[in-house]
A protein has these predicted regions:
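Proline-aspartate-enriched helix->loop->beta-strand connector
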Residues: 13-18, 22-39, 163-180
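Short, structured coil segments at secondary-structure junctions
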Residues: 7, 55-57, 144, 225
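Flexible, solvent-exposed loop/hinge segments that line or gate ligand/substrate-binding clefts
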Residues: 169-230, 235
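Extracytoplasmic substrate-binding proteins
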Residues: 33, 45-129, 150, 158, ...
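Alpha-helical scaffolding within the catalytic cores
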Residues: 21, 48, 159-165, 212-219
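Single conserved hydrophobic/aromatic residue that forms the stacking wall/gate
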Residues: 1-8, 12
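A residue-level marker of the well-folded mature domains of exported/periplasmic proteins
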Residues: 130-131, 138-140, 161-169, 249
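His/Asp/Glu-enriched short active-site or ligand-binding loop at hydrolase and phosphoryl-transfer sites
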Residues: 134-156, 230
Length: 292
């Protein structure tokens, strides 16, 4: 994407196409270290890929922002800081991150009300309905003072349920994730996903919140009718800036306790302080109160 290619042009030119990652083409890049996600570890071990890397003398490390974001983000950033000779910057980020997390978790510690909540991943883009279980955004719901129903239905990770099951669960709070995805031309029946991201404007984001609700049966849910339906940028699910999703979820679940928190403003300032590209777009939407 232009956002990344302009910020890190040298790295962008050296990308390996999906499916072409072999020890041979990694060696051709002559890396100091290969960084992989924790999601890849088991498959890499079982396939013998790590053994092949060891034999070739390739160094590697694993990071995780997805499986357990609140536990692994700081450790992953410290690891990256060490690898990139940016220990001080990583430590500064972790101080910032930890304070943000504490602001949320300390406030919700005394709140007894834990609203039943579901996170519907890529609603309207993927087939209905993929839920966040006890991982990524599902973990954030729990930390933000919600009762994430996902693990009780799914187990430990995101997976599918039917629209009928979603209606049966009928959560008090419904959060969907949206993004900037191209429509699949092979799908004969596709409902519009929520447009969120760096190129999304608020008006379009609000309008497209209606898309997932057009799936047959979803109109029976109470949350959209009671103003408890929200949309979040999908890429927060696997990113070190997941803490802004935590803020948004806490504000949606407990609006009075987090009336002073403004995730959009905080995220914009984060770009100015930490990122090599400018803030733009829309990342959080509460369609029932978008004009307030």
């Amino acid at each position: 994407p232009p956002l990344y290619s302009s910020a890190a042009s040298d790295v962008y030119k050296r990308q390996i196409q999906k499916g072409d990652v072999t020890v041979e083409n990694l060696l051709a890049q002559d890396p100091d270290v290969v960084v992989m996600t924790l999601d890849q570890k088991k498959a890499a071990e079982e396939s013998g890929f790590l053994a092949d890397m060891d034999s070739a003398g390739l160094r590697y490390a694993f990071i995780d922002f997805r499986q357990d974001p609140l536990e692994h983000t700081a450790a992953s950033m410290s690891l990256l800081g060490g690898l990139l000779d940016k220990d001080d910057r990583a430590a500064k980020f972790n101080d910032f991150y930890s304070q943000k997390v504490r602001t949320v978790t300390e406030r919700v510690a005394g709140i007894e009300d834990r609203p039943d909540t579901l996170v519907w991943m890529a609603a309207g883009f993927n087939d209905c309905c993929s839920l966040a279980g006890d991982a990524n955004i599902g973990k954030l719901v729990t930390a933000a003072g919600g009762h994430n129903l996902g693990p009780e239905v799914l187990g430990t990770d995101s997976s599918q349920i039917t629209a009928e099951k979603l209606v049966e669960l009928n959560p008090e709070k419904l959060i969907v994730t949206g993004g900037e995805w191209a429509r699949d031309p092979n799908k004969t029946e596709t409902y519009r996903h929520v447009e969120l991201g760096y190129q999304a404007d608020e008006k379009t984001a609000v309008e497209t919140c209606a898309g997932p609700l057009q799936i047959p049966g979803i109109d029976l849910l109470d949350a959209p009718k009671t103003g408890n339906y929200y949309a979040l940028y999908h890429q927060f699910y696997d990113n070190p800036f997941n803490v802004f999703a935590l803020e948004a979820i806490a504000k949606w679940l407990h609006p009075e306790e987090f009336a002073d928190v403004d995730p959009a403003t905080d995220f914009e300032q984060f770009h100015a302080d930490w990122l090599p590209y400018d803030y733009s777009g829309t990342f959080f939407i509460d369609p029932a109160h978008a004009d307030s």
